[in-house]
Amino acid sequence: VIDLLTADFIAAMRDKLRTDMNNYTDDLANGQCTTFEQYKELCGVIRGLAFAERHLLDLAEYIQKEENDE
């Protein structure tokens, strides 16, 4: 079982990443990009946040597995 501090950190980070990703996606959907360059940049930011979230979830899974193996 992941200790409470680690679990709280992971949950807080995931919530922040998800909130940012949703906000940027809303900006994209609402036509905030006026140039293709802005569109590409915003897509890159969203992609980076998605990668960060995936890595965070993978890390949480790894920690859980390691603790279960002990």
Model-derived features: positions:
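N-terminal acidic leader/helix
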Residues: 1-30
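Short, charge-rich amphipathic interface segments used for partner binding and complex assembly
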Residues: 33-65
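Short intrinsically disordered terminal tails
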Residues: 1-5, 61-70
